[in-house]
A protein has these predicted regions:
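Detector for outer-membrane/organellar transmembrane beta-barrel domains
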Residues: 233-371
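Outer-envelope beta-barrel architecture signal
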Residues: 32-40, 89-95, 140-144, 206-208, ...
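Outer-membrane beta-barrel "beta-signal"
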Residues: 233, 401-413
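Outer membrane beta-barrel
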Residues: 26-48, 65-219, 227-229, 236-240, ...
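Cleavable N-terminal export/targeting peptides
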Residues: 1-28
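Extracellular loop and loop/strand-boundary signature of outer-membrane beta-barrel proteins
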Residues: 66-70, 118-120, 185, 220-222, ...
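Transmembrane beta-barrel strands of outer-membrane/channel proteins
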Residues: 40-46, 97-101, 148, 212-214, ...
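Transmembrane beta-barrel outer-membrane domains
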Residues: 31-33, 73-79, 125-129, 189-193, ...
């Protein structure tokens, strides 16, 4: 299997993912002192993908498809979802529990849920549950979250991506669709992922909030031993009231870092061949979102060393443990005319060679243009049309292009 397909399949498998946008409030039920909420979505799209038929199009880690063109009826960037939450206040504490199930409409040949665990980027727990967490806290001192939920690093990048309601780049798996497309993942930001975590979030103070957490460390290629957690942190400032103000928006800054080691069984061999026995990876990102009377702009960027591209700690190091630098970002502008939102965005994700690494077909850049139209038939139902032009370039000069047309609908409840 080509490297580009392997990465796309891994990402698609994990993308049963992002929390539901606040399109609707959900279905609330009072049960004694508890408030029970059910929410979710169903979506489906027809996607026509025109792939690269050239001869010099091998890009390891490239996200543009090559070979046969394909037509598919599939999920978009979001899978379907059914999210259950329960909340109450007891003994001066706000407490809640959330479980989210994320199926899709496409056939799957995945292994059963009782297989061995794999604590690496883009993985999922059994029984298709992407969210399983509890919270407790109070408005006076903040909230503690324990369980599995979306990460902090690059979270806002994907939640503000207009292709969240659509498809974005279909990628190499469109010929045999996975349950999610790529959107702008790996083409403007690194996937935030869903990770086991213990996270504290401060109270909102005049628009400012902060979150800090310890996370399950992720495997980094052959570096699968961990004696310390992954750390993530985020700061954000929001301004304006969407219900009353013409000008609203937010600014955010996030960071991620972790340390990984080679298994003890590999240490002697690594030492003999000059291969590093431990690696570190850290990254930062920042973004701005501004909305003025229906005209919305998002500017986002990230930089890291040893954090990889597309997914956290994917392609982060070379064969001897050299840490690769990566950076990227996207610009997006949308305008809402009554029920119709029109949007355009461009994003890139770059991956550099490690110091001393030889030139190869390793991906150097994935980038894409997206043109989208999103029409709200009701507050719950949206029709979507997108055109996507994606390109992958390798360090040795090979490149591939993909053009997608996506038409479909998404329903939130």
């Amino acid at each position: 299997m080509k490297a580009r397909v392997k990465y796309a399949i891994a990402i698609g498998a994990a993308l049963w993912m992002v929390p539901l946008t606040q399109a609707v409030a959900g279905i609330d039920i009072a049960a004694g002192d508890w408030k029970i909420d059910f929410s979710g979505n169903i979506n489906a799209f027809y996607v026509d993908a025109s792939c690269d038929h050239g001869t010099d199009n091998a890009v390891a880690g490239g996200l543009a498809c090559t070979g046969d063109n394909s037509a598919a009826v599939r999920n978009g960037l979001l899978p379907a979802a059914l999210v259950f939450s329960a909340s109450t206040r007891q003994d001066n504490l706000d407490i809640s529990a959330t479980i989210g199930f994320y199926p899709g409409i496409n056939s799957s040949a995945a292994a059963g849920v009782n297989g061995a665990g794999l604590p690496a980027a883009l993985q999922t727990p059994g029984i298709d549950a992407r969210q399983e967490f509890l919270t407790f806290g109070d408005a006076s001192w903040g909230t503690v979250k324990l369980g599995r939920d979306i990460g902090l690093f690059a979270k806002d990048a994907i939640l503000d991506d207009m292709t969240l309601l659509g498809v974005g780049t279909a990628g190499p798996t469109n010929i045999a669709p996975s349950n999610t497309s790529l959107g702008r993942i790996g083409l403007g930001y690194i996937y935030t992922d869903w990770e086991p975590q213990i996270t504290y979030t401060t109270p909102n103070w005049m628009g400012f909030t902060g979150s800090f957490g310890v996370f399950q460390p992720l495997d980094d290629g052959a570096y699968t031993a961990h004696n310390s957690p992954q750390f993530q942190a985020g700061l954000a400032y929001s301004f304006g009231d969407p219900k009353s103000d013409q000008l609203t928006g937010k600014v955010w800054l996030d960071a991620v870092t972790q340390h990984a080691k080679a298994p003890s069984a590999d240490v002697a061999t690594n030492t003999a061949y000059g291969i590093a026995n431990d690696v570190s990876g850290s990254g930062v990102d920042a973004g701005v979102k501004v909305d003025v009377a229906g005209l919305e702009a998002v500017v986002y960027g990230y930089y890291g060393k040893g954090i990889g591209t597309t997914g956290l700690y994917v392609l982060a190091t070379d064969a001897v443990g050299g840490e690769r630098k990566s950076d990227g970002g996207y610009i997006q502008v949308t305008y809402k005319l009554d029920k119709l939102k029109l949007g355009v965005s461009y994003g890139i994700s770059d991956l550099q060679l490690a110091d001393g690494e030889l030139t190869s077909d390793l991906v150097r850049r994935n980038d894409s243009f997206v043109f989208g139209a999103y029409y709200g038939i009701t507050k719950s139902l949206t029709l979507v049309g997108e055109f996507i032009d994606s390109k992958s370039k390798a360090h040795d000069g090979d490149e591939a292009t993909e053009k997608d047309v996506a038409l479909g609908a998404i329903l939130f409840f």
